[in-house]
Design a protein with these regions (language model features):
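Short, ordered loop/turn segments at secondary-structure junctions
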Residues: 4-5, 35-38, 62-63, 80, ...
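Phosphate-binding glycine-rich loops and their immediate beta-loop-alpha structural context
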Residues: 1-59
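Loop/helix-junction capping segments adjacent to catalytic residues or to phosphate/diphosphate-binding pockets
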Residues: 13, 40-41, 65, 119, ...
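Flexible glycine/proline-rich
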Residues: 76-222
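Short glycine-rich anion-binding loops that position phosphate/pyrophosphate groups of nucleotides
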Residues: 62-65, 113
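Short Gly/Thr/Asp-enriched flexible loops that form oxyanion-binding sites at enzyme active sites
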Residues: 66-78
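Short acidic, glycine/serine/threonine-rich loops at helix termini
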Residues: 2-6, 43-45, 69-71, 98, ...
């Protein structure tokens, strides 16, 4: 936990606090299950227990291909894994499934472990599901077309979200400027940004001045 001394091979748990804050903004009652050990049985039993008293389960980490990544296995044993991995960046190793609880199928979203990937996949993938489960009809945020103040290339067939800030050019025209680093572990990049630019699967190149789809954080955080 933040504030405690870390030991070798440990990192601070930022995701739990970020997710709880984002969920509470959506009016959710959050039941925090804490940090789980890298133990297959413990993870399975914690997910089973959580499914009995909650309408949606949300995890972060433990969903990649490491020896200690047991979340996918637990989902399959307790219910069904509907998909694992999407052609997106950041957040490729996201998974969605359900856990059987008597006569209910409780949805579970297994988010990646990197802080930026967690926040981006929550805002663009998990958030609409939370709103849908809450009875909301308007589950998709508004995007705005704004000229880019950057150039970038990307892989065709993959959807990407870039962290950007609003800037003014010499003519006082509003543009979006890309955060200089792409690492999924740089949480400060989210704090320093005004929103996300979404590049669809068919886009392979953005040149400075091109119109891009801009999602202000105000659309998904308020």
């Amino acid at each position: 936990d933040p504030g405690e001394k870390s030991h070798s091979a440990q990192i601070f748990d930022i995701n739990r606090y970020s997710l709880m804050s984002l969920l509470k903004k959506l009016g959710c009652k959050v039941n925090d299950m804490g940090i789980l050990p890298d133990d297959k049985d413990a993870i399975r039993e914690s997910i089973r227990s959580a499914s009995r008293n909650n309408d949606l389960l949300l995890t972060s980490g433990g969903v990649s291909m490491g020896e200690e990544d047991h979340v996918r296995t637990a989902i399959n044993e307790l219910g069904k894994l509907h998909f694992w991995k999407l052609l997106i960046k950041p957040g490729r190793p996201i998974a969605l499934g359900h856990v059987n609880d008597e006569d209910r199928e409780v949805p579970i979203i297994a988010l990646p472990g990197n802080p930026v990937a967690v926040m981006v996949t929550f805002l663009r993938i998990a958030r609409p599901l939370v709103l849908l489960l809450s009875g909301s009809v308007d589950i998709h945020p508004n995007y705005f077309s704004i000229p880019s103040a950057f150039s970038v290339t990307k892989k065709k067939g993959r959807r990407e979200w870039l962290r950007v800030s609003l800037v003014r050019d010499k003519g006082n025209n509003l543009k979006v400027k890309k955060f200089p680093f792409d690492g999924s572990g740089i949480l400060s990049s989210m704090v320093s940004s005004d929103g996300l630019v979404e590049l669809s699967e068919d886009i392979v190149k953005v040149t400075e001045g091109d119109l891009v789809d801009f999602l202000p954080f105000s659309e998904v955080l308020n």
